[in-house]
């Protein structure tokens, strides 16, 4: 295994290269600090994409280190906040960022929640299944979802019997997990449900009286409907595996999942319920993804390669509102917090809940509404306060690195140089001219940065930190 972004040469990346690489790492991961960004940019864009798409080349985060800080996990496995804290640790420290980003992506598509089961080990299994299969063939992923105890309980497939079907999973696998409304019939839903009869789990999930042990998939052959079924024009004694295989070959599936990928990685789309009546933001981009899906036989990795190497992806900078998870992870990457395990990791769950998102517990099977719906007066205030409180400390390693970079520019740094240098180090971040003018006016109040004496260096450090908090409070910082 090797270090992601490891230097292959001593070439210096151009500002353009850095901006493009920063864009890729914001979307295919959770951002990068400046040192990481420069290491990435010493490789070609295509090579970095290839590394991102092949996470097995790199070591996983050291979960065993976290276990030493959380010994109570072994005795008490029912606290979702602790597991979400561990997930944040992975997001911030992983050498496999796209693996974690795809886990978050699929968590929104295959929305499954803790509230119904109140069984944390099963939700942890569910997230790990998404992580393992997130860039596999879509068949493999959809099979994993269909056999997942958390999903089975969430959509009542444990109550789907050969003698009495429950259509919940049969409906949602078509409406929300693959094809979208308008591409199937009510008979297709019913026959899909029949095909998944007998797909259940080995023991009831709820917390009491069954305890907090892991749950496994179980197929009950005696509870399965073995009669002939017709699904999307295919007739036979179909079972769940057949349904999944048929779904994966449909152009409607390629188009629906492609639009999800575009919405998550490229630019904000309308909310999913409107997709049957509102066209995509960029139909040609969706066509590109559909073609790769069909040509590759539903290979998610191939579709992602098409997406990340396309001109329309490279041009779509700051076109998505960060989700609460993305926002907090980006601030943590900037501050350098949690580079080592910390017993406060679990508090991050409360932070993102205040911003409108609770990992492992989406509001419904529809998942979270995205884009501008993440933002209202309350959630924006939570974001700004969190960013300011986190970054308003020059002793944090990420903040100290920013101060040192600006100081290395020499004495008597002009206000304009100060503002532009900071925007470059935070992003590079693109601002509206009005926002930049506001920052410049603030910087001009105290003149050039001076570093010649201890007193002036201390004052300049305070000014850098203060301007940094203003930058992350800007409207533009809410965009990914």
Give, region by region, the residue ranges found by the protein language model:
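Short, Lys/Arg-enriched N-terminal segments with co-localized hydrophobic residues
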Residues: 1-9
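Active-site substrate-binding loop specific to GH73 endo-beta-N-acetylglucosaminidase modules
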Residues: 7, 83-87, 119-340, 478
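Short, compositionally biased low-complexity segments
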Residues: 18-27, 59-63, 75-78, 164-168, ...
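N-terminal accessory alpha/beta regions
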Residues: 34-133
């Amino acid at each position: 295994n090797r270090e992601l972004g490891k230097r292959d040469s001593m070439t210096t990346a151009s500002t353009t290269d850095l901006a493009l690489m920063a864009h890729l790492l914001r979307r295919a991961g959770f951002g990068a600090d400046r040192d990481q960004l420069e290491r990435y940019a010493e490789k070609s864009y295509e090579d970095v994409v290839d590394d991102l798409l092949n996470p097995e080349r790199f070591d996983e985060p050291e979960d065993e280190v976290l276990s030493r800080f959380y010994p109570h996990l072994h005795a008490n496995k029912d606290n979702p906040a602790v597991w979400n804290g561990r997930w944040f640790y992975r997001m911030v420290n992983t050498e496999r960022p796209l693996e974690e980003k795809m886990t978050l992506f699929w968590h929104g598509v295959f929305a499954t929640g803790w509230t119904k089961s109140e069984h944390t080990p099963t939700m942890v299994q569910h997230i790990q299944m998404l992580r393992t299969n997130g860039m596999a063939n879509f068949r493999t992923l959809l099979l994993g979802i269909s056999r997942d105890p958390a999903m089975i309980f969430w959509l009542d497939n444990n109550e789907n019997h050969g003698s009495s079907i429950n259509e919940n999973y049969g409906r949602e696998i078509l409406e929300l997990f693959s094809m979208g409304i308008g591409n199937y019939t009510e008979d297709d839903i019913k026959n899909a449900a029949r095909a998944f009869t007998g797909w259940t789990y080995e023991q009831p999930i709820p917390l009491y009286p069954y305890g907090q042990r892991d749950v496994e998939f179980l197929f009950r052959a005696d509870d399965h409907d073995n009669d002939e079924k017709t699904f999307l024009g295919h007739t036979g004694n179909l079972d769940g595996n057949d349904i999944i295989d048929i779904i994966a070959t449909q152009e409607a599936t390629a188009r629906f999942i492609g639009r999800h990928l575009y919405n998550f990685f490229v630019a904000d789309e309308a909310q999913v319920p409107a997709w049957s009546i509102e066209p995509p933001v960029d139909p040609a981009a969706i066509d590109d993804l559909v073609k790769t899906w069909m040509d590759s036989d539903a290979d998610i990795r191939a579709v992602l390669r098409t997406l990340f190497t396309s001109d329309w992806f490279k041009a779509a900078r700051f076109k998505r509102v960060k989700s609460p998870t993305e926002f907090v992870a980006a601030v943590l990457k900037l501050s350098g917090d949690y580079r080592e395990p910390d017993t406060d990791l679990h508090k991050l769950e409360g932070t993102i809940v205040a911003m409108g998102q609770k990992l492992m517990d989406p509001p419904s099977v529809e998942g979270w509404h995205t884009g501008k719906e993440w933002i209202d007066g309350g959630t924006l205030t939570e974001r700004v306060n969190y960013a300011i409180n986190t970054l308003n400390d020059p002793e944090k390693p990420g903040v100290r690195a920013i101060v040192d970079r600006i100081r290395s520019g020499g004495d008597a740094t002009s206000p304009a140089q100060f503002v532009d240098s900071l925007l470059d180090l935070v992003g590079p971040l693109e601002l509206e001219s009005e926002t930049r003018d506001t920052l410049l006016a603030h910087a001009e109040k105290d003149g050039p940065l001076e570093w010649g004496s201890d007193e002036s260096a201390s004052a300049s450090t305070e000014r850098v930190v203060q301007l940094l908090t203003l930058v992350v409070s800007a409207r533009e910082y809410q965009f990914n």
